[in-house]
Amino acid sequence: MQIVILREEIEIPKNVVVDLKGSIIKIKGPKGEVVKDFSFAKGIQISLDGNKIVLETTFANRRKKAVFYSIVSHIKNMITGVTKGYRYYLKIIYTHFPTSVKVVGNEVQITNLIGEKNTRRAQILEGVKVTVKGEDIVVEGPNLEAVAQTAANIESASKISGFDRRIFSDGIFIYKKEVIE
């Protein structure tokens, strides 16, 4: 069943500045800035009305409705990110060979994972801050997608293949995700 008019209004907090050019939304806040392009969403109009972001579409079928509410969620995540920020925690786990992790430029270098001589590298995306504290890695930033992808890059760079995972539990694993308060 198609819905004739679908409209959603998202409240903009006082300490957030929203800039809209076509389908590109730039949101600035105390924690940083997030830019996202929604040009893929055909038939969905995004506009500013005072201190609200207004999204509208007409004759929304099931697929268009799914895209519409995905965009609403993305914009809400962007506003939360620039006002509070996102943080992921990862744990370095090793049994015999002490794994060392350090941040060099825009990459995380993992050395001595299960005694390997080569260095594994994971890319840090733009706008994301990574810190290593003992056996914990903290990934934080205003863009949820960039923070989550950086944490996933670190986790997948430390993935071990060719070993029984029940015995060789070495690696780096995400154990906590949170919104910074």
From Swiss-Prot:
<protein>
    <recommendedName>
        <fullName>Large ribosomal subunit protein uL6</fullName>
    </recommendedName>
</protein>
<dbReference type="InterPro" id="IPR036789">
    <property type="entry name" value="Ribosomal_uL6-like_a/b-dom_sf"/>
</dbReference>
<dbReference type="Pfam" id="PF00347">
    <property type="entry name" value="Ribosomal_L6"/>
</dbReference>
<dbReference type="InterPro" id="IPR019907">
    <property type="entry name" value="Ribosomal_uL6_arc"/>
</dbReference>
<keyword id="KW-0687">Ribonucleoprotein</keyword>
<dbReference type="InterPro" id="IPR000702">
    <property type="entry name" value="Ribosomal_uL6-like"/>
</dbReference>
<dbReference type="InterPro" id="IPR002359">
    <property type="entry name" value="Ribosomal_uL6_CS2"/>
</dbReference>
<dbReference type="GO" id="GO:0022625">
    <property type="term" value="C:cytosolic large ribosomal subunit"/>
</dbReference>
<keyword id="KW-0689">Ribosomal protein</keyword>
<comment type="similarity">
    <text>Belongs to the universal ribosomal protein uL6 family.</text>
</comment>
<keyword id="KW-0694">RNA-binding</keyword>
<keyword id="KW-0699">rRNA-binding</keyword>
<comment type="subunit">
    <text>Part of the 50S ribosomal subunit.</text>
</comment>
<dbReference type="InterPro" id="IPR020040">
    <property type="entry name" value="Ribosomal_uL6_a/b-dom"/>
</dbReference>
<dbReference type="GO" id="GO:0003735">
    <property type="term" value="F:structural constituent of ribosome"/>
</dbReference>
<dbReference type="GO" id="GO:0019843">
    <property type="term" value="F:rRNA binding"/>
</dbReference>
<dbReference type="GO" id="GO:0002181">
    <property type="term" value="P:cytoplasmic translation"/>
</dbReference>
<comment type="function">
    <text>This protein binds to the 23S rRNA, and is important in its secondary structure. It is located near the subunit interface in the base of the L7/L12 stalk, and near the tRNA binding site of the peptidyltransferase center.</text>
</comment>
